[in-house]
């Protein structure tokens, strides 16, 4: 210990002597070469600094935890390595040995945690020499980032039964479905990331969508939320990008860089209706682009656009965006869609319901995006009524219509209870339910209005319950904090408005309570789908009274279809409402007629193929031969889908998020 202290002391004396004109000779061993040399104050530390940078021949340390992705500086320290000459022998720190910039791994966030301020730093993959490398080869792993991306997830307990979900594909020359991920060539990077996510085998939608997308066919897919839709399009798209490389987009990026370098040309674009859903898809993209040169980015409203622009400027190959913010970015000249090969519209019906059709048409038809037939387009949603399918004609070319499970139905994994509760008794009944539920269970309570959410949260708080709430008027930060409190169990009760029905990607919600029932059955389906996700068991309780008569028949049909207990009073009300209204009992929602489960092109003779993912007895034929009690009028599905439920082995993978 004393020896070290002496060395430190001596080293300090030597450094001080270097600044002392009178004692330089004695400290430098009597060297005459340095005698009397004057060093101006502003230059006195330059030699020491240079020695630090150059002592191992690489300026910044080669250690994997180097300080910043701006890494080194040139010999003259005039500019960062971002603008430095990529050739020559000059070092770029930890990026030197790898011939790339700050992407040790997925999601473009660098080699460490994936979100640190250093890892997000300056080097852009577009400006790197990565195009000279084979994009299909994985980059070195990052243990820290791997832990961050793949440590969570619960695959559920009832996956086996979901191999039997029936599927129908409509269109010409439908590619055969797969039974395992290894049945289709997706490359080393994708297969490695599938293993890291602990996905054992594809869900029904993935079994059929992956080979269709790999064959570069346009696709319209109807599948329930939580069924693995996100991976169904991300896996084949990323696989193709790894195989094909950046192509002309990289050349355009470099050419644009000569004049300021700020416009990005993504290869793939994913449009989502809400910011929460966009973030969810982005997080999945980070997983599947781990150890690749693909850099995913996300842009959405309600957040600092300046930060999003700075993130884009570091490079963007796969962009996830909400329509409004994307139009803003395009008008600012930050995004160009000239070389977009893959377009995905996720929750397409939701986007149209929210009024995004003008923005979507502006993006797809009125800008520089390649036309249909040149680009590859996919639409995913839980519902696709005929009206939306007709709109899809403008975006899709010779597409395959894929329906997996009964679109709009619920899973048998969810136990549904409907109880008659007068409006004045709802709060008292809710307290009884909460008291009967385990303290560690996550409970989601749906109400109809923002004011109702705040009021109910305040009531529960004063009753001594740890709770929080979300609705459309909350800021992005408040919503994220509420979700974090709920997920972590600090506030195991979450009160949410209807805008949250398609959100909340939380794998362990045990109980969904419809404090206020929605006005249409599709909203009900999406709400109770927050529990019983991907193979787990769940409970949904709904408070019913005279205000909810309009959905009586639909609710009855849904309960019967899912083999749930039906209260006798509900059957009587449905019977009375059916004849009193003089109708078939269907509510007048825009989705009436089968939840979009029928391909409208079948009326003009389009071909179809029917598959079963499991037992042969469940492989009913397509066409129109099977009617159903839901009054679908002999459509191509009718009774084609049974009520076997729907699941998968993916818990953190669903694409449905709460949002506005």
UniProtKB/Swiss-Prot annotation:
UniProt motif (DEAD box) ranges: 346-349
Sites bearing N6-acetyllysine, chain numbering: 55, 117
Disulfide bonds, paired cysteine numbers: none
Entry's Gene Ontology BP terms: cell differentiation; spermatogenesis
Catalyzed reaction equations: ATP + H2O = ADP + phosphate + H(+)
Name of the protein in its database record: Putative ATP-dependent RNA helicase Pl10
Positions contributing to ATP binding: 199-206, 223-230
All residue ranges annotated as the Helicase ATP-binding domain in the record: 210-402
Enzyme nomenclature, EC number: 3.6.4.13
Amino acid composition bias (Gly residues), ranges on this chain: 621-632
Pfam family name, one: Helicase_C
Biased composition (Low complexity): 12-21, 602-620
Biased composition (Acidic residues): 1-11
Region spans: Disordered: 1-117, 598-632
Composition bias, Basic and acidic residues: 44-66, 93-103
Leader sequence segment: none
Residue span of motif Q motif: 179-207
UniProt keyword list: Acetylation, ATP-binding, Developmental protein, Differentiation, DNA-binding, Helicase, Hydrolase, Isopeptide bond, Methylation, Nucleotide-binding, Phosphoprotein, Repeat, RNA-binding, Spermatogenesis, Ubl conjugation
Record-listed Phosphotyrosine modification sites: 103
Tissue spec. comment: Testis.
GO MF, one annotated term: ATP binding
Helicase C-terminal domain location: 413-574
Physiological role: Putative ATP-dependent RNA helicase. Possible role in a key step of the spermatogenic process.
């Amino acid at each position: 210990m004393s020896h070290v202290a002496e060395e430190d002391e001596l080293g300090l004396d030597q450094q001080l002597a270097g600044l002392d004109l009178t004692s330089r000779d004695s400290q430098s061993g009597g060297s005459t070469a340095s005698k009397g040399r004057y060093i101006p104050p502003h230059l006195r530390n330059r030699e020491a600094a240079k020695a630090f940078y150059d002592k191992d021949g690489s300026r910044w340390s080669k250690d994997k935890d180097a300080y910043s992705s701006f890494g080194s500086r040139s010999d003259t320290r005039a500019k960062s390595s971002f603008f430095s000459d990529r050739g020559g022998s000059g070092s770029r720190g930890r990026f030197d040995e790898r011939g790339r910039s700050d992407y040790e791994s997925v999601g473009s966030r660098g080699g460490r945690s994936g979100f640190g301020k250093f890892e997000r730093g300056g080097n852009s993959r577009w400006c790197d020499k990565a195009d000279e490398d084979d994009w299909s080869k994985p980059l070195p792993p990052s243990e820290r980032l791997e832990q961050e991306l793949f440590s969570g997830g619960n695959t559920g307990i009832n996956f086996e039964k979901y191999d039997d979900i029936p599927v129908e594909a409509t269109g010409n020359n439908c590619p055969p479905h797969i039974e395992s991920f290894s049945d289709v060539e997706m490359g080393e990077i994708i297969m490695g990331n599938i293993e890291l996510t602990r996905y054992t085998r594809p869900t029904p939608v993935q079994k059929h969508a992956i080979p269709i997308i790999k064959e570069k066919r346009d696709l319209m897919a109807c599948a329930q939320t939580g069924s693995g839709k996100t991976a169904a399009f991300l896996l084949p798209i990323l696989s193709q990008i790894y195989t094909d490389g950046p192509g002309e987009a990289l050349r355009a990026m470099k050419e644009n860089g000569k004049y300021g370098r700020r416009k990005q040309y993504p290869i793939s674009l994913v449009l989502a209706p809400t910011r929460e859903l966009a973030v969810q898809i982005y997080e999945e993209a980070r997983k599947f682009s781990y150890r690749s040169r693909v850099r995913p980015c996300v842009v959405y409203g309600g957040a600092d656009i300046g930060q999003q622009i700075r993130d884009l400027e570091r490079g963007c190959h796969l962009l996830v965006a909400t329509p409004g913010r994307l139009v803003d970015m395009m008008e600012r000249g930050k995004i160009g869609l000239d070389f977009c090969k893959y377009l995905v519209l996720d929750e397409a019906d939701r986007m149209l319901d929210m009024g995004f059709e003008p923005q979507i048409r502006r993006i797809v038809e009125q800008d520089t995006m390649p036309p249909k037939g040149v680009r590859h387009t996919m639409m995913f949603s839980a519902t696709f009524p005929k009206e939306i399918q007709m709109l899809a004609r403008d975006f899709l070319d010779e597409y395959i219509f894929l329906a997996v499970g009964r679109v709009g139905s619920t899973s048998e994994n969810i136990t549904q209870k409907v109880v008659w509760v007068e409006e004045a008794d709802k709060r008292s009944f809710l307290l009884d339910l909460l008291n009967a539920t385990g303290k560690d269970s996550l409970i989601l309570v749906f109400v109809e209005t923002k004011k109702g959410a705040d009021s109910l949260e305040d009531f529960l708080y004063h009753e001594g319950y740890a709770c929080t709430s979300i609705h459309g008027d909350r800021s992005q930060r408040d919503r994220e904090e509420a979700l974090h409190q709920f997920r972590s169990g600090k506030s195991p009760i979450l009160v949410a408005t209807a805008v949250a029905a398609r959100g909340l990607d939380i794998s362990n919600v045990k109980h969904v309570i419809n404090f206020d029932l929605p006005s249409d059955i599709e909203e009900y389906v999406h709400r109770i789908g927050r529990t019983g996700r991907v193979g787990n068991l769940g409970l949904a309780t709904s408070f019913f009274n005279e205000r909810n008569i309009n959905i009586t028949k639909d609710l009855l049909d849904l309960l019967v279809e899912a083999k749930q207990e039906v209260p006798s009073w509900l059957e009587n009300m449905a019977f009375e409402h059916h004849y009193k209204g003089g109708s078939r009992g269907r509510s007048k929602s825009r989705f009436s007629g089968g939840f979009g489960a029928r391909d409208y092109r079948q009326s003009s003779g389009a071909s179809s193929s029917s598959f079963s993912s499991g037992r042969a007895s469940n492989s009913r034929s397509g066409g129109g031969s099977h009617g159903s009690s839901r009054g679908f009028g002999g459509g191509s599905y009718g009774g084609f889908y049974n009520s076997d439920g729907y699941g998968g082995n993916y818990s953190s993978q669903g694409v449905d998020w709460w949002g506005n």
